[in-house]
Design a protein with these regions (language model features):
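A short loop-to-beta-strand structural motif that recurs across blades of beta-propeller domains
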Residues: 67-70, 113-115, 157-160, 208-210, ...
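Blade-level signature of beta-propeller repeat domains, shared across WD40, Kelch, NHL, RCC1
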Residues: 289-342
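A short beta-strand motif characteristic of beta-propeller blades
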Residues: 29-37, 78-85, 123-130, 169-181, ...
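Residue position within the beta-strands of beta-propeller blades
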Residues: 54-57, 106, 150-151, 201, ...
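Short loop/turn segments that connect beta-strands within beta-propeller blades
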Residues: 73-77, 118-122, 162-166, 213-218, ...
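Beta-rich, blade/repeat-based domains predominating
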Residues: 39-52, 65-66, 86-103, 130-149, ...
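Short glycine/acidic-enriched loop and turn motifs that connect beta-strands
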Residues: 59-64, 111-112, 155-157, 206-208, ...
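Bacterial N-terminal signal peptides
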Residues: 8-17
């Protein structure tokens, strides 16, 4: 009996010698909320009003030659209508309502412009043409006066346009807003914190979130940009909650990363779990843009194959190539407790 008892003692000592991990992420699952109709693909930007979600398509697959904004019921996720944006390209990105004017604006990457769109008919007009000749308008944010801030992924710039539109001015240009990385998009998602004392900018190719301090608010001169947090794999769209936590779509990690105002990660939500028999991603696949509403975070599954841009394959490229049905996912916006020491 000595050997069995000795084995038990040795096993107990070995187990006691291991230090438990500091934390393990209790990932809330991402479930399908809505499915894009036939003829539309690659949902990127997302916004919401009292009754509807509006989803802008970045259609690099050639499904259509015009830009599409797909409208879903806010409660059920049922498809209601598709707005065809005939005065723009098929490469639509960030979309948002100006909270001051009520205008629906969308970034048209292919047209190097921001469009104003009628949310009922899809009729559009140019709101802000992007200067410089190589514009990459990607995401939108607004200050309390209704001024519009536009991230430019290709010119390392945040532009500012007045509430009624017009040619924007370069508000901030900085190397931290550009990239030589993959995916080849620099400045991307935008979000002001609650007191408008800083503007946060996701840099997708650099895997960073950049903080632009605003010591006198948006009306004053912006401070020097600084890296707020790095190693967010493919930092894309941003949302910010009432506690000033940043919700970041990590498009190369297939997850939503939540960081608190100090930059400490407090949650990693969602994951990718393959392609279902209908050709739709299960969970998150190249998530692009989050929006927080009704106790959930809604996320567009862009499912973009980077090889279509002549780039080397990413780890999810072969999966994205299999997607034939494009989706919007939903995750509980409750921050789950950590499993482990805190």
């Amino acid at each position: 009996m000595i050997l069995p008892r000795l084995a038990v003692v040795v096993c107990a000592m070995l187990l006691a010698s291991f230090t438990p991990p500091a934390a393990a992420w209790n990932r809330s699952p991402a479930v399908r909320f809505a499915t894009l109709p036939a003829g539309t693909a690659h949902p990127e930007g997302i916004t919401v009003d009292a009754r509807h979600f509006y989803v802008a398509n970045f259609d690099v697959s050639g499904e259509t030659s015009v830009g599409n904004i797909v409208v879903f019921d806010r409660r059920s996720g049922r498809w209601l209508r598709t707005l065809q944006i005939t005065h723009g390209s098929s490469l639509l990105l960030g979309i948002a309502f100006n909270p001051v004017t009520g205008d629906l604006l969308v970034c048209d990457l292919g047209g190097q412009q921001v469009l104003k769109v009628d949310p009922q008919t899809g009729a559009s007009s140019v709101f802000a043409p992007i200067p410089g000749g190589n514009g990459g308008p990607n995401a939108l944010a607004f200050d309390a006066e209704g001024n519009v801030y536009i991230s430019d992924s290709f010119q390392a710039t945040i532009w500012r346009a007045p509430p009624g539109g017009g040619i924007p001015v370069a508000w901030v240009t900085d190397p931290l807003l550009g990239t030589a990385g993959i995916p080849p998009f620099g400045a991307n998602g935008l979000a002001f914190n609650g007191h408008a004392s800083a503007l946060f900018v996701a840099n997708t190719g650099n895997d960073t979130v950049v903080r632009i301090p605003l010591p006198d608010g948006p009306a004053g001169m912006p401070g020097t940009p600084e890296v707020f947090v790095n190693s967010i794999n493919g930092a894309d769209g941003l949302a910010i909650d009432s506690a000033d936590n940043l919700w970041i779509a990590a498009n190369q990690a297939d997850e939503i990363v939540v960081v608190n105002p100090s930059g400490r990660v407090i949650a990693k939500l969602g994951d990718f779990d393959g392609i279902d028999r209908q050709g739709a991603p299960v969970g998150l696949l190249f998530p692009a843009s989050p929006v927080l509403v009704d106790g959930f975070v809604y996320v567009t599954n862009l499912a973009l194959d980077l090889r279509g841009f002549g780039l080397p394959q990413a780890v999810d490229s072969q999966w994205t190539a299999e997607v034939t049905r494009h989706t919007i996912a939903r995750i509980s916006a409750r921050i789950p407790p950590l499993r482990g020491l805190q």
